[in-house]
Each structure stands twice: as structure tokens, then as C-alpha cells.
């Protein structure tokens, strides 16, 4: 959403992925040996079966739109919104949130970014050395990113992710946060 050219690079039709084989998108109803019954596709016999359920990430890391045209338009709207924003809230300071904060402050240096992390430190998951966390926090601080840890939102912002609409939210710790738009950078899960 930060890089205008990114959307053109990430959407690839699945039917062009394999030279010897095909991609079938559907719900597996039954598996018997090397045969899978897939809703809308009937029974499919294969030498090898790959069950790739994927991972669900919040937008803009992953798009749920069924059409790349719709997804690309949404990304373009977010980019335009970032151009007109002065304050962005990123909820979550794991790897995704940190990357997003870096991208936003690089492409839009006029935007003030606040990161809110429920855990007591950035990069809460994983076995990161304290020196790594400190170095990343220092780099973000040099970019003007405010990092708030050990606190969480009392309620989600009253606007959708990536939409430009100024709002105010309160954290569980009583902080009042104001932003023009927000991003959810937590909650990845197996699909």
C-alpha cells in the first residue's frame, strides 16, 4: 500500500504457476488414497497432493477480495489516504508492524506513526536478542515513530483499516490516541 508499483507485482494468476500440473481452488470434501473430492470440481486423481491452506493476515498484508482489480483499487485508495494523512496508528509491533512503520516513514516522512503493542516489548514473538530489539527501536525512534508497549486498545478504532478518517481511541492503560488512519499488524493465523 505504500509503494504504488507493489500491487502490480504481487497479483499473479494461479493458473500460470505450474508448468506440469494445475492449481485447484476449493474445499476438499474427502481424501481417499491419491484421490481428493473437491467441491465444484468432483474427484481429482493425482500422483502427489499438496494441501496448502495458507495463512490469514490482516489487510494490507493479505487481501480477501476475490478480484485483483478490486484489491488493486483498495491498495491505491490506501496509498492516496497515506499521502493525505498526518498521523497513523499501527496496532502491533511484531515483524509486520515494524516493517509497515518503516515503509510508511520512508515513503511519507511527514506522517507521524504510533505503534501500540500489547506485550511489554517490540517483536514479542520469537527468540530475538535484546540488542536486536533495541537497535530496531532506535531506528524507529530516529524516524519519529512513537512506540507504546504493555498496553492495548480498549476498543478498535471506529473506522476500517486504511481508511482516512480522523479518530480517537483509548487504551486499556488510559492513554488517548489520535490518528487519521490505522493498520492492524497482529493476528496472523493458519487459514
Language-model segments: residues:
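Beta1-alpha1 glycine-rich phosphate/pyrophosphate-binding loop at the start
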Residues: 1-22, 99-130
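FAD-binding core/adjacent interface of flavoenzyme oxidoreductases
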Residues: 16-89, 172, 176, 183-185
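Rossmann-like dinucleotide/flavin-binding elements
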Residues: 58-60, 73-117, 189-191
